[in-house]
A protein has these predicted regions:
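Ligand/substrate-recognition segments at binding pockets and active sites
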Residues: 1-57, 104, 131-132
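Short, solvent-exposed loop/turn and secondary-structure capping segments
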Residues: 10-15, 62-65, 139
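Short, solvent-exposed loop/beta-turn-alpha elements that line the ligand-binding surface or hinge
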Residues: 42-46, 67-96, 100, 129-158
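Sec-exported extracytoplasmic/periplasmic mature domains
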Residues: 19-27, 44-48, 71, 96-106, ...
Length: 158
């Protein structure tokens, strides 16, 4: 299991825990922890069988994940981060249609269908949602966005 050891909070410890849990069910796995400068080119080149990878969605749109992580790797942005090689022509067709669909209800239904197929096929194995804590005084309130970027307009001081 390839794992960065200086990219995510407790990344190497998470990988150690996964390797230990898999050993309990008979899945022999060797941990290969490395600095992110080595890790990312390694997995991007497909030189891995399983790896820990984090993902954030700055667009707040599921299409970003579908297009980048799930679509079959091809040219341009399509499947650019699909390092595991997941491929399903039906999911690809849905993603291509989602890209140009303007009807919100139809688009949402297609997103749900594509994500549902991917989940049933175990295209990825989600481990956890990393929350990066922010420290502040008790009287300071701010909404913690999924992309971990503070918006000053959302800060409230009581």
């Amino acid at each position: 299991m390839d794992c960065p050891n200086n990219r995510y909070i407790n990344d190497e410890a998470i990988c150690q825990a996964v390797v230990a849990m898999w050993a309990k069910i008979g899945v022999k796995t060797k941990l290969n922890a490395m600095p992110r400068a080595t890790f990312f080119p390694k997995v991007a080149n497909g030189d891995t069988s399983i790896y820990l990878f984090g993902w954030g969605v700055p667009t707040f749109d599921a299409f970003y994940t579908l297009e980048s992580l799930i679509r079959t790797k091809s040219t341009g942005a399509s499947g650019a981060f699909n390092y595991g090689g997941y491929s399903n022509p039906k999911v690809d067709a849905l993603i291509d249609t989602i890209k140009t669909e303007t009807d919100d209800a139809k688009r949402t239904a297609m997103i749900q269908e594509a994500l549902g197929i991917h989940a049933k096929e175990f295209g990825t194995i989600p481990l956890h949602d990393q929350i990066i804590p922010w420290a502040m005084k008790k009287n300071v309130k701010v909404i913690h966005r999924p992309d971990n970027r503070p918006v000053i307009e959302w800060v409230r001081i009581d």
